[in-house]
Amino acid sequence: MKTLNKLMLSFLLTFAVLQAFSYDFQEGDLRYTIISANPPEVSVSGHANGTSAQGALSIPETVLHDGITYTVTEIGVRAFQYCQALTGDIVIPNSVRRIEQEAFEGCSGFTGTLTLSNQLTYIGESAFLGNNLYPMHLHGNLLLPESLDVIGSQAFLGCSGFTGLLVLPQCSYIGQEAFRSCSGFTGDIVIPTSITHLEDGIFAHCTGFDGTIVLHDNIENIGNGTFRYCSGLTGELVIPESITLIDVMAFYDCESLTGTLNIPSSVVEIGASAFAYCYGFTGELVIPESINEIPHGAFKECVGLTSVVIPNTVTKIGQLPPDCLNKEGAFEGCTGLTGTLQLPENLIRIGGMAFKDCTGLTGELVFPPSLQRIDAEAFKGCTGLTGDLVLPVSVSIIEPDAFRGCTGFSSLQIKNAVSDVNIMRKAFYGCTGMHDIEFTEKVSHIGSNAFAETGWEADQPDGILMLLDWCLGYKGNASNLALQLPETTRGIADCAFTGNTNIKSLSIPDDCPMTKISDSAFYGCNKLAGLLTIPNGIKTIGQSAFERCSKIKNLELAPSVETLDYFAFDYCTGLESITSWAETPPLVKYSFYDVNTDIPLKVPCGTMEAYQNNSQWSAFTNISEVPFKLTVSVDHPDHGTCSIVKHGDCDNPESIVQATPNNGHEFAFWAIDGDIVSYDQTYTFNLEHSTALKAHFDFESVGENDEYAFAVYPNPGKDVLNIRTGLKDAWVEVYDLNGRMIYRQEITENDTAINTTNWSEGTYVWKVFSGVSTGSTTLAETGKWIKE
């Protein structure tokens, strides 16, 4: 069937070619096809010598054949296509009513004028088309007869030699790009009243027009690029109220148009880059309420505009489509816009580069509560914006460079977000005036250099840069750095330590709430050496997280690790062993390129076969099983100690741990992830999974005379926060990391239980004050508590 279809297609193509060059008779140098016997009419099918024809072309009004006089009424399809040696003028006799498609395409030898029939009604597609290989050299004025009804697509494309378009008749149709690149035309463009749709690119690249555009009240649509690059057109652009669509690039680079741009309320859609680079428009631009989206590039570099009024009907400004090649912001580079920018109440999205380099905008930038995302470079370089930058709770994405170089902002607030917030690469880079930063615990990702070169960064002392429990990197140039992240670390920004050659060791606490080591976090830290332990709680090791850390010798992956993203440990050529405590082999995405696969890979009891059958882990040839990992810790080092008495193995899993309280304390319980598993001080159990046990201690009985006995437990916890103290006349306060007090209660008993069921996961700060009744309050104790 496929073969038959191919044969049929080949036959049809061959038939079409033969049909295009077939003829009925030849008289002189021309061939003719009879198109009517009564009255006798013929079409000129071509030259007797085909494309080798030379010299002047003479087309008669009539031709005598076999005693019959035929009227020549048509120039046929491709009749003289690519006859490059034909020279002189083209004179179409007045008998001709139609010039079919591609009739004179590529006839680059004609250097004279074009005279059209005064009875001509139809000019087909590409009839006089010229291109780079076969340019058209016709010159002089192009006089189109009043009889003309249809001008096909690309009919005169590239006829740059014409110097004037004398009459644009009352056609019913002018096709796409009909006069594109006719750069010699001068004067005005007057659209006939018979045209209701201006097709795409009709006058694109007609740079010679130096008059005005006259649009009548019957026009409904202005097509894609209709007047694109008509840079010489002048005067005020009057858009009639009949128009509903101004399509993509309709007036792109019409740089000499002047006056106020008035868009009527009839317009329901403005295409991307429709008025980009129209430098001459001035004054206030009012977007009609009929518009609900301002596309990307719509008014780029309309530098003469001084203000813009955007109605509340607009929900998106400048959203870039996926894989957009022509990336232009809606108001990018509109340097003439001044004063405060009033954004519409129902705005959902501010697109890429929407207000980039609008340096004249001043004052505070106030966002509507409906806003959900701010795309890349949306306000990049808006140096005149000042005050506090407060993002609404609905914002979930701040894309790369969104506020880069906005030097006037003094602070940033991202509070009480209703969903996870993604702050991407260099979002606030170079905001040198931004000294205070507050954001919600719902921040789920911080891209590389998101807060680099800000006032906040400049204010920080040398050391680890921590912003509300997010690690952004290291400030200073300490050598042989033993990098130890805080226990409260919730995340590491992308590329936080990329290329830091001073780090010699890395310690990430087991109890920190972080679940991912971000992309390229330690890329190229080629002094990082020895044992690298990925602690429990980490689920993902990001792309290139430790790529080219060539001096790491031993790698230990916690039981929680699920994914090693692309290139995570590529070129870690110094690795001598890997231990993975995960019972299910983590997903590996080509994460060990150029790592010696003969090194030992140690996996938990009973999992060797799973690793050997895994498509990525099976590359390692030396896989063996080891006992499950067992670790013990205490709730507070001042409360007591603990130890492993017996560590079970693959054959005998029985294990024993022991807790020893310090003076003034007593053992309470053993817990795993906050869940109590035993009240036995010496706890015996079977080690069947990698296990992290924590010993919890209480104070010995607290009496009324105990001036200062204190405990907060469990920590981390889930549904309850217990505070034990001997203080009287006291109260407790709990704050989130934005400094907002979320709980306050007077302490009346030795033990105070706070229900935390409805609290969000994260880190909280608790404070206990004494001296309530005296009015001389004192902070007695403070610390952090983690809700899991």
Residue ranges and their predicted role:
Residues H47-N49, V657-G664, R724-G726:
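Acidic, Ser/Thr
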Residues H665, N705-Y713, G717-E788:
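C-terminal outer-membrane/trafficking sorting elements
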Residues V77-R78, E100-E105, G124-L129, G152-L157, ...:
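Consensus positions within tandem repeat domains that build extended binding/scaffold surfaces
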Residues A37-P39, A53-E74, Q84-R98, S108-Y122, ...:
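Structural signature of tandem-repeat unit edges
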